[in-house]
Amino acid sequence: IYKRSDLKIEQKVIGPAIISEATGTNVIERGWLGSLDKYYNLILSRAEEKKSEKGLGTSVDVVMLEVFNNLFMNIAEQMGATLANTAYSVNIKERLDFSCALFDNSGALVANAPHVPVHLGSMSEAIRTVIKLNKNDIFPGDVFVLNAPFNGGTHLPDVTVITPVFDSDGKQITFFVASRGHHADIGGKTPGSGPPDSKHIDEEGVLIDNFKMFDKGVFRESEIRKILSSGRYPCRNIEHNMADLAAQVAANNTGIVEINSMIEQFGIETVHSYMNHVQDNAEECIRNAIVNLREGKYEYELDNGEFIRVKITIDKIKREATIDFTGTAPKNPFNYNAPMAVCHAVILYVFRTLVGSNIPLNEGCFKPLNIVVPNNSMINAKYPSAVIAGNTEVSQLTCNALFGALGIIAGSQATMNNFIWGNDKIQNYETICGGTGAGPNFHGTSAVQTHMTNTRSTDPEILEARFPVRLEEYSIRKNSGGKGMFNGGDGVTRKLRFLEPMTVTTLCSHRRVKPFGVCLLYTSPSPRDISR
């Protein structure tokens, strides 16, 4: 690794190497030379005749490990760019409520883009469901759709499109790519698919479990339309669903092209080897972080008087952690329930945040973690539990509980402040931002999405152009964060005026119980919902 400012004119840098400078980084691959000409331009030239890079080898090269870290993440980022550019809905196109990732041929997460954490840590189970239910029936050109919360989904509006990637002979699956997008409406009792009083999954919309939308390249359009229009509460705007599904297919196709390009350049053996090295590196980073943690437990009270209970124990010899949720409340009779995939996503996110280096979120992060979750509890709900608030509220509450047990940061707003509104013609979904918790030597941040969500606020001009609504105020709610030596971040005030009748749903938390502080000075005031 070289600093460009340290290089002399005509000094040769033999690849593989990295040359860093204030405004960028240059990677010199094996078989290339880099040098500065008399004008200090960096000139790259081939040092040897081009050979197939399939001979790159399978042992770990630290430079190539970093290259592949970024290659894998970049593929997911390119998928996300395609999805944002081609989607129809404001929810996906503007709010960026989607995630893209690539997986190995067993369904293990390899890499993701920095999209929505609650999506990314839960998608592996969706891939494994497709593999399990379609054994010997997956072919080139197939595309699968799934939103079933109990088979790797989160809640019904989050629809996952999964595409296998085959080798050049079309015989062996080398990877899977997947995109998960929050559709503005997937049916249900209320517009936007967020009924506050749902007790059964059927009341929340259309459930899609392992549907093959493309069969060997043939689009089964009539069949998917039939599914979207089925059930007690069908989708309200199927054309919008179809447009966003098409965008997700396009995103996956981008991933396939990028993966095949990488395989063409480096060879499948090298790509698969570094895929494993990337996961091994993530595992080692998590193990190194674990030895610096302290054991702890936390009882996290919810607004309904129930508790999420968690105990974290550390084995510093094995460098492993056990996360035990024994004692957590049983399944909620309404919709504050999360499937196991969401619980896994939260744990993966929390432990990934403990790593200072820029590693991709992947399956390796799970290997040092032993997870104990009571069966049929509110964080391990089974069919036919209602789960619309699980992906949003329960994930945030569980995340705060884990940070409480670790004692490393104060509680965030711990809610996504889901604000869902619409009618038979239009539907929209928002998560309203808030404040992050303070740390041992820093203040929290005001007016941001926290933890398990990572979406954007819709641009006011686009919001008012696409919907019959006027945004009257969007401001920071000053001094609303918890007070202490280091203060929690402030929340926001958001006022909308509807220009025609709408049904409004809110799914929120911490209206009675305040987020916790560390060292317990002052907690934040409770949020307020709707003024009339």
Predicted regions and their residues:
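C-terminal, non-catalytic interaction/recognition modules in large multi-subunit enzymes and RNPs
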Residues: 1-524, 528, 532
